[in-house]
Structures are given as structure tokens and as C-alpha cells.
Amino acid sequence: MNQGSPVTDRVAIITGGSRGIGLGISRTLAEQGFRVAVVATRPEAPEGVIDALGGPERAAYFQGRVDDVDSHAGLVAEVVERFGSIDVLVNNAGVAPEERRDLLEATPESYDRVMGINLRGPYFLTQAVARQMLRQDAAAGGAPRGVIVNVSSISATTVSTNRGEYCLSKAGVSMATRLWAARLAAEGILVYEVRPGVIATDMTAGVKDRYDALFGQGISPMPRWGQPSDVGGAVAALASGAMPYSTGDVIHVDGGMHLPRL
């Protein structure tokens, strides 16, 4: 990765990159000139996605499940075979509980599902991709060797007692960011956390009326929903390598919702 140079040679993996926040990230990175490897669970990319990302010369779709840790090495090999290298990993794929339940009614099955996809999978995918980055030539001029961005949630620090497993998973992602940042800094690999607030996606469509009202009541200094492109812009800024002396940082994309206010 060469800081300040065109990014046409850089390759980014985006998990969950075919819809919602992930598609917003994929689009923004593609607009910035990245070649994008979109990873999602569907057998094939949704219609129009690859064309929207620059066509098959610039984008490719890979079916995969982040919670299938045994498949990670194969996924990394496929991306390298297709594009030649991996310069950026965006751990975006995530799920909410299929049913919100009070802590006293939560089930081990829901806990294991959410933690497997949101935390365990990204943790070990980071391991697999970092190993690949270390096999690649170091960047010249002190530029980052690679960038890893973990997409967490305001729920990493904000309590929701009807989806405890989700909050725990995102808190874990936040700690994983700091762990990997500390481990990989000397290797020239930067690791960041992007922490979205309330973003308009299919995942949040079911609570639209609730949050419309809360925005009207002042829940956030910026009284609007966030958009996938807002998250995409933050990820692209980090992926560019423009912050070579920073790692482990949290970038809030929540309209100021995280700010303590009286």
C-alpha cells in the first residue's frame, strides 16, 4: 500500500458486503478505486452488485460464512488467486438475535449463533488474513502493510437488555480490535474499529417507527438516521492508509449519539 498514490492496485475484502452497511462500504471502496472481494452467504451475488462495483475486472463475489472458521484459509487463497494480494480486510458481517429476549429468557442457541458470526468468525478471519498480509512484501516508504477495519456497533458500550448476546459480541469486537492492533503494529498492519449508531438498513427496518420518534426526542445531536454510505466513508478513510501513525482507534459513526450529555 502506497500512501497518497492511486489505489487501483489495492484489494479489499468486505464480509457481508452485498447488502446494508456492507454494500455501502463496498460501493465507497470501489468508488475510491479499490478492487473489492465481496463475501456473503448467498450462492451468488445479488443481481447488479458486481456491475455496481466496477464489473468483474474490479469486483468479485465469494460465497462464505464467517462463522465457518475451517473455511477461512480457503477463502483467503481464493481471493489471492483472483486478485494477487489482500491489502484491506473489513470485518462487517454480523447478525442480531432472531428474536429479542430479556436476559432471563435468552437461549444458549441464540448466544452461540450471534457470538459465532459477530465475534469468533471475524477474530479468526483476521488471523488468516493477517498471516497472508505478512507473507506479502512490506510497503515502501513507511506506508501501512495492510489495514484491518472491524465494524462494531454503539451496542459495544450501550446496554440493551433484550439482546444481551448482541451487545456482548460487539464489546468483544472492540476488544479484539485493540488486541490485534497491539499485536500487528510492529508488522506494519493497522487495525481500527468503526462503531456505527442507528443506520438505515434492512436490519433496522423493524424499529424504524421507534427510532423516528427517538430522533424527534433528541436521542442524537444529529437528528437523523445514518446511512450505509456514512459508514462507507469512514472505512474508506481508514483503508486509504492516511493515518499511518494511528492504530487501535475507534471511529464513531453515530451522529454524536455516543456523547455524554446533560
Indicate where each model-derived feature is located:
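Active-site helix of classical SDR
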Residues: 126, 169, 177
